[in-house]
């Protein structure tokens, strides 16, 4: 499909950028006051030296400058700022919509935009893996991703908006039940969460699903000093309603053992009361009924009261309850018998291998352990129920097409005492690190080798050996050893621990070191020492049968939902251990993540004090090392940013090549690999930017991929623009055709009204008054309001405002005229006036000059009904009188060139039709009140105009009184104006080809300059005559109003020709050749590039610097290619001095006076000869230098000497470009005038 030419004047910058061969539409640069200067590098792949220390230094620079995000290719590194930087506002969010990651600074919104765009564009499931240690900001990053996707995913449907609100409401709800304050983080996630957002084919969210992992249920019963239990307990005890306090016995957190044991009740930056309200609001949004909320808080109260049960030793050494009332209230909350509660806690049911059931009284430590197990079981199952209930509300409303997963799981943990919980957490983090290695390091390099891509292998640490150490079955790993030890000595926890330690000591693994009472595992994040004591008992994860019996005896239906399984007293089969469960969950999570396209966010904790200004370089360096950022940078710098199979690549980008697509249809008949190569060729992608593998196409730089995506996005816009352009042209043609028809119709209709009014004028005069020849012209029309008094703008509106003409009086006639003023002791005198007639009155308006300012005032306002008669003569004069008969004032005697039209309008506006027109040999009027006088009108052929003297008016003889107006003259025939000229359709036509009807596109032959010897010498032109300056008007209003006077009869002034101006000065010397804008540098030392993007240099050669960076590397270029080179190896070469400028020739002497030709006195001079072109043609692409003294002489080079240009002078073209340039300028001016004439209406 051919590229259509856009019409002129369409400033579509994006379309211009999308055309590979088009010139970019560069807009005016503006200073951006919001953009900060970049500190360090925003992408670590651009760092000058690849090392852990250099990465740490760059992160520190950016952290100190409030820049917390940095890229490693498509991986985002985030440093926790421990403060609000104001970078998550709606304005910031909107700025990342539809932008690729290179268009905007690094941000978590850019990762979310990329995941959402790729899901819609490629129809692949996406996932965002957020990793890092506890307190590094993983939960905050997950919330911001959810915020962005909910904002950009669109959808105005109420169900879609409901899903968005529910997804966002899961954050405060699950945080209150699953987060807690630790020594390292005030809002630490004590559970893992994988949120999967489900979308339909249009990219709208229709559902979601949450999977939780590894809830730290031991925190319910014990916390170390200065830590807290889960947030919900403090929210509930501080903010519970009065009904909850009365029904559930809720008191302050200091009254419960589980919330007061660590001695921390309040946390800086956390408002428990406000967050409690947020939790209740989230429950309502998700759809939890009030009954369900009541049951949830009943279980929380039961857990709190369970912790307050205390035991003492009885006389037999067994456990006995200290306060029976606490047990009674707990039984009330669990809706069961208090005796069953005491029996479940103080009596242990054992089932040996022989099948005998033994009930053994528990001592105080055993009873406390059973009590805590009861509380942990209730909270763990309550949390699972809440997650299931949320998933029920988030069930997909319609069919799902793709999904975006967000993994937020607590990070790597190392404490002074690490047990089973830390082993499980660190194991899951090892699995996530293994995914990262598999997808970014190992799999990538294996794929390069498999696809036969040129590649230099990079060494990295594969943590699979650590994962096998923990989860392997053969040879037995740590989880298998725990399970075997439990089978061997399941009744004695201490014996189980000893058996497990013996198994650990027998293992042979370089990443495992046994010690006395503990063992050390060398994780990817560091060495961790795990305590063996109690580790096997935690691995059992068994709820005692006595507690299960207690839950079964409860009458509360909600408890049966929390513990749905019935107790089988005869089942002695060992249930799955906690290690088995977490291993199965971790493997399921890995399988889910491997099915999606991952995006990575690596979070870093800058210090252990939660300080917004402290940056602990030692701790951050450790995190940089175990996160493998250095290896990631090396692979990203040498790798390929994008790879796709040939089939999918062609399916995605076939629109970009005319050989693979036509009008959106796929027309390629060859194989996919050849088609992919054809697409890259037609889009002008350099061969260095991609490689073709066996089954996939590999693109090196992400900028190349973004360019392809941009061109694909603009394809449909460009096609739509073509259709719209043709459709708009068609509509414009119809509109223009209709406009022409309407214009002609209105012209005929309005002209008919004016002609009818003119015919009425003949009837008003009754055929008794001689007519002026100009009054009978066929083009004469009765326009009425000649001064524009009824207009809203212009000088007429200013007159209307000056005389305060009422808005309800419509002006039907206005013009300028004169009135005869009679003064005592002096002869009568004509004075100018303004006549305005409305449907009610006739106004005589005077203008007087007071203090050099014109004052406009109403001199007389005569009601039309007060006019008894109008007196005129039978001659062709313009005089008439208004017979008012006022006893105080004389009748006005007026003269007006539009008298007949005035009488016609007056007859139509006169109330009751009482218009009395007296026509006689003299004009009758009251010169003084009640004193009539006659003004004689005589014919005098010597008077060119009407002349008044001594009560007599002298005028010439006119046309016969019975004369009629001549017919309307026919217009001058003109050729019909085509629709493809002027502004209707731009040059190029709607189809992109030159229009056949326009003359502007015809090729013009270029003038060939003649030899210098054959060129005639130009003749000096006559000097221009000085033009007197016009006299300024006294007032702009008066100057802008037309004066209605008769032209001198049969007299005309002889037109004089304007004297042509002198020739322009001699052209200046041609400008020197432009120096190179790009600086040149000489190579001082030999430099051998170490990577693909480093440019090898040879000593002494000259290179051009294309881009300068502050990190010590510049982008250089020469004939061999381009690449990055160290700045210390280069020295700038001074540019050569410009050549000397030749002196300008002396201008010619002033010309003499022009020769006069005979009687008419017209100036005659010979035809000027074009001046000689400059000696050297100006450099292409540069403007010719203008003459030193610009003048507007009003002449053209091809002029014939006439200066009459109807008031418009053509600007003098510059002669510095020679004859050819002058002729081209003249031709452009002529074409411009012709175009303007074509655009004029009929």
UniProtKB/Swiss-Prot annotation:
Compositional bias segments (type: Polar residues): 1047-1057
Record: residues binding ATP: 132-139
Domain named IQ: residues: 717-737, 738-763
Bias kind Low complexity: ranges: 10-21, 1011-1020, 1191-1226
Alphabetized CDD domains for the sequence: MYSc_Myo1 (cd01378), SH3_Myosin-I_fungi (cd11858)
Record flagged with keyword Nucleotide-binding: yes
Limits of the Myosin motor domain: 39-713
Bias (Pro residues) ranges: 1059-1074, 1134-1154
Entry remark concerning the domains of this protein: The myosin motor domain displays actin-stimulated ATPase activity and generates a mechanochemical force.
Family: Belongs to the TRAFAC class myosin-kinesin ATPase superfamily. Myosin family.
Protein's recorded name: Myosin-1
Native source organism of the sequence: Botryotinia fuckeliana (strain B05.10)
Gene that encodes the chain: myoA
């Amino acid at each position: 499909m051919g590229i259509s030419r856009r019409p002129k004047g369409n400033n579509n910058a994006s379309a211009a950028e999308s055309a590979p061969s088009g010139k970019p539409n560069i807009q005016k640069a503006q200073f951006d006051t919001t953009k900060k200067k970049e500190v360090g590098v925003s992408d670590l792949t651009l760092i000058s030296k690849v090392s852990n220390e250099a990465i740490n230094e760059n992160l520190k620079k950016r952290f100190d400058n409030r820049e917390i995000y940095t890229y490693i290719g498509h991986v985002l590194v985030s440093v926790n700022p421990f403060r609000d930087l104001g970078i998550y506002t709606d304005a910031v969010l909107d700025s990342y919509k539809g932008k690729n990651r290179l268009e905007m600074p690094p941000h978590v919104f850019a990762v979310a935009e990329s995941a959402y765009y790729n899901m819609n564009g490629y129809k692949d499931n996406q996932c965002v893996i957020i990793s890092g240690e506890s307190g590094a900001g993983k939960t905050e990053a997950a919330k911001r991703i959810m915020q962005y996707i909910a904002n950009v995913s669109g959808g105005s449907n109420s169900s879609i908006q409901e899903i968005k609100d529910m997804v966002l409401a899961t954050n405060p709800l699950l945080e209150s039940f699953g987060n807690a304050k630790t020594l390292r983080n005030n809002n630490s996630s004590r559970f893992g969460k994988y949120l999967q957002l489900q979308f339909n084919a249009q990219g709208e969210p229709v559902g979601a699903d949450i999977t939780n992992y590894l809830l730290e249920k031991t925190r319910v019963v014990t916390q170390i000093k200065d830590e807290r239990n889960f947030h919900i307990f403090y929210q509930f005890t501080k903010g519970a309603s009065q009904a909850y306090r009365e029904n559930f016995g809720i008191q302050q957190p200091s009254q419960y053992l589980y919330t007061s044991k660590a001695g921390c009740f309040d946390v800086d930056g956390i408002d428990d009361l406000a967050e409690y309200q947020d939790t209740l609001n989230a429950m309502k949004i998700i759809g939890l009924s009030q009954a369900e909320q009541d049951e949830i808080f009943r279980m929380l109260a039961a857990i709190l009261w369970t912790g307050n049960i205390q035991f003492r030793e009885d006389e037999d050494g067994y456990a006995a309850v200290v306060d029976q009332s606490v047990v009674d209230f707990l039984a009330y909350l669990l809706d069961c018998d208090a005796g069953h509660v005491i029996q479940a806690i103080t009596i242990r049911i054992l089932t040996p291998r022989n099948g005998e059931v033994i009930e053994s009284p528990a001592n105080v430590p055993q009873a406390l352990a059973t009590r805590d197990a009861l509380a942990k079981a209730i909270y763990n199952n309550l949390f699972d129920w809440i997650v299931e209930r949320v998933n029920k509300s988030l069930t997909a409303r319609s069919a799902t097409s793709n999904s975006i997963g967000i993994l937020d799981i607590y990070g790597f943990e190392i404490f002074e005492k690490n047990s089973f919980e830390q082993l499980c957490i660190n194991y899951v983090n090892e699995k996530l690190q293994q995914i990262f290695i598999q997808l970014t390091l190992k799999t990538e390099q294996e794929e390069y080798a498999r696809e036969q891509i040129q590649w230099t292998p990079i060494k990295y640490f594969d943590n699979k050996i650590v994962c096998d150490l923990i989860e392997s079955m053969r040879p037995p790993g740590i989880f298998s050893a725990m399970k075997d030890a439990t089978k061997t000595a399941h009744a004695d926890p201490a014996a189980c621990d000893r058996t497990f330690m013996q198994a650990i000591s027998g293992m042979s693994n370089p990443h495992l070191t046994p010690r006395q009472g503990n063992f050390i595992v060398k994780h990817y994040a560091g060495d961790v020492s795990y305590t063996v004591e109690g580790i096997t008992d935690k691995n059992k994860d068994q709820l005692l049968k006595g507690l299960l019996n207690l839950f079964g005896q409860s009458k509360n239906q909600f408890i049966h939902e929390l513990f749905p399984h019935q107790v089988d007293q005869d089942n002695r089969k060992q249930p799955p251990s906690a290690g088995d469960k977490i291993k199965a969950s971790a493997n399921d999570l890995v399988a889910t993540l491997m099915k999606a396209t991952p995006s990575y966010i690596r979070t870093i904790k800058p210090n252990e004090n939660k300080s917004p200004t402290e940056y602990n370089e030692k701790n951050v360096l450790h995190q940089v090392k175990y996160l493998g950022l250095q290896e990631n940078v090396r692979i990203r710098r040498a790798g390929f940013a994008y790879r796709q199979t040939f089939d999918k690549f062609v399916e995605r980008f076939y629109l970009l090549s005319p050989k693979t697509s036509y009008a959106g249809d796929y027309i390629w008949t060859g194989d996919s690999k050849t088609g992919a190569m054809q697409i890259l060729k037609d889009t002008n992608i350099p061969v260095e930017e991609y490689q073709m593998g066996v089954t996939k196409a590999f693109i090196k730089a992400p900028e190349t991929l973004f360019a392809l995506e941009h061109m694909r996005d603009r394809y449909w816009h460009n096609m739509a623009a073509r259709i719209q352009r043709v459709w708009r042209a068609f509509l414009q043609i119809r509109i223009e055709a209709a406009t022409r028809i309407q214009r002609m119709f209105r012209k005929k209709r309005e002209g008919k009204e004016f002609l009818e009014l003119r015919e009425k004028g003949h009837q008003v005069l009754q055929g008794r008054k001689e007519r002026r020849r100009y009054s009978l012209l066929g083009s004469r029309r009765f326009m009425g309001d000649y001064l524009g008094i009824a207009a809203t703008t212009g000088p007429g509106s200013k007159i209307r405002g000056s005389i305060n003409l009422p808005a309800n009086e419509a002006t039907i006639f206005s013009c300028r005229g004169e009135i005869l003023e009679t003064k005592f002791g002096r002869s009568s005198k004509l004075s100018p006036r303004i006549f305005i007639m409305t449907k009610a009155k006739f106004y005589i308006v005077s203008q007087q000059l007071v203090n050099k300012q014109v004052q406009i005032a109403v001199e007389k306002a005569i009601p039309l009904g007060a006019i008894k008669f109008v007196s005129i003569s039978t001659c062709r004069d313009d005089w008439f009188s208004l017979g008012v008969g006022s006893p105080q004032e004389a009748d006005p005697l007026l003269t007006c060139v539009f008298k007949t039209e005035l009488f016609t309008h007056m007859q139509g506006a006169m109330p009751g039709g009482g218009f009395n027109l007296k026509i006689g040999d003299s004009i009758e009027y009251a010169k003084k009140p009640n004193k009539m006088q006659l003004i004689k009108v005589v014919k005098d052929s010597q008077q060119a105009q009407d002349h008044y003297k001594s009560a007599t008016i002298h005028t010439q003889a006119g046309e016969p009184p019975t004369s009629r107006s001549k017919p309307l003259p026919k217009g001058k025939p003109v050729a019909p104006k085509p629709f493809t000229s002027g502004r209707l359709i731009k040059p190029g036509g709607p189809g992109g080809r030159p229009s056949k009807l326009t003359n502007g596109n015809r090729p013009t032959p270029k003038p060939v300059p003649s030899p210098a010897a054959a060129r005639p010498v130009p003749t000096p032109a006559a000097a221009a005559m000085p033009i007197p300056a016009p006299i300024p008007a006294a007032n702009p209003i008066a100057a802008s109003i037309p004066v209605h006077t008769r032209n001198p009869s049969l007299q005309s002034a002889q037109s004089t020709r304007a004297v042509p101006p002198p020739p322009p000065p001699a052209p200046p010397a041609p400008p020197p050749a432009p120096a190179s804008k790009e600086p040149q540098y000489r190579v001082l030392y030999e430099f051998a590039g170490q990577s693909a993007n480093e440019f090898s240099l040879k000593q002494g050669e000259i290179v051009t610097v294309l881009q300068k960076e502050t990190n010590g590397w510049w982008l250089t270029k020469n004939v061999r290619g381009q690449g990055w080179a160290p700045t210390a190896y280069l020295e700038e070469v001074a540019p050569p001095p410009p050549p000397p400028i030749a002196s300008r020739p002396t201008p010619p002497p002033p010309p003499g006076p022009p020769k006069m030709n005979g009687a008419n006195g017209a100036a005659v001079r010979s035809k000027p000869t074009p001046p000689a072109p400059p000696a050297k043609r100006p450099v292409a692409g540069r403007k010719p230098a203008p003459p030193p003294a610009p003048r507007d002489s009003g002449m053209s080079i091809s002029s014939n000497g006439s200066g009459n240009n109807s008031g418009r002078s053509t600007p003098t073209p510059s002669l510095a470009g020679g004859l050819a340039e002058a002729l081209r300028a003249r031709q452009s001016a002529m074409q411009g005038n012709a175009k303007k004439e074509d655009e004029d209406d009929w």
